Amino acid sequence: MKKILTSLAVVTTLASTLSADFARVEMGAGVWGQTPSGYATRTDGDGFLNLDGTYRSSENNSQEMYAWVLIKHPIPIVPNLRLEYVSVYDEGLTTGDVNGIGVTDSPTSLDTKQYDIIPYYNILDNTFWTTIDLGLDIKIIQSHTIVDAVDTTGLGGIAVDTTIYDSTDTTVVPLLYARARVQVPMTGFGAETDVKVISDGTNTLYDIRAKVDYTFDIFPIVQPALEVGYRVQQLTVDDGDTQVDLNYAGLYAGLMLRF
């Protein structure tokens, strides 16, 4: 009987280990301290901001929320799933012609919400403490742009701080996705990086993160964790009429739960 109980205990432990390895849910949320920089120029009076002129970032730091969920399952062929959300914010000045109104150094805000739907496959799944994922990121970008007038000079009697442009747009962009993670054996420490990128050589969008995290193995079902990292987003466009060079970078930190 003792041997049977011992064998059952071993089998149960192995089954739990395999289940944890092949079906897993992780989630996290925190704050990204972004420092934006760059500019956007439009020269044909159409498209970005309906602008014939230039927007320049004021490079003011902003604390924005992010969240993510990772769902891994044991079903072959069907990809795993990662969902992400992040808010990106910038304030700057616009000079040029906006909606037919001449402006100089008009306060402008770019408020962007990004939603990432990422189906992916495990190339390595904690093999020798190493994980590699490859997939496709479907990035949904919802941008809200506001341009305010600063005075009435040349504006046809428009009052101070009147909004002269207010627009919301949604864009869907596919990107390649890759993630690599290394777990330090016999500890709760891990390090990982992920890259989302699309480029045709002239126009480029990428989103790169690198982080370390620590998992507290104190509960049998759910394990809390902390993560700290650095994130960079870069958008570069040069198609003749439009030139864009916008960058968001900074440290982020958050809480995680592993199931």
Where do the protein language model's features map onto the residues?
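Outer-membrane beta-barrel translocator/channel fold
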Residues: Q223-F259
